[in-house]
Amino acid sequence: MTTGQGGRQDQLWVSAARFDELVADALDGIPAPLARAMNNVVVLTEDSHPEEPDLLGLYEGVPLTERTLDYAGNLPDRITLYREPLMSFCADEDELVHEVMVTVVHEVAHHFGIDDAALHELGWG
């Protein structure tokens, strides 16, 4: 889970379609061996989380490190990136590109079983 740290006064706006492109570009930047190792996960975008409006991204599922031999037939894990809080966190599209990439890395890391403490130690918190 990634949360913002307060909005900015100069509100950036990008369309939902453009935001989807930025997320797709960030996913394309994941090294091929890691992308191939992502198992049973879907990446979605939404305007905002209904209960936590400052949430930038959210991983929901069973991390690869916690899956057992009987893990089968489950619905895909979900990584959701939230457009509105990410826009409010950024002053321009270049900053948004960076924050989308950081958020994608953060949530994909959770899929691989990397927790927030380890992400902070690695500089991705």
Residue positions per predicted region:
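Short hydrophobic/aromatic patches at helix-to-coil boundaries
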Residues: E121-G125
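Short alpha-helical catalytic segment bearing the HExxH-like zincin motif
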Residues: E99-E107
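Active-site rim/adjacent substrate-binding subdomains
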Residues: M1-E99, H111, A117-H120
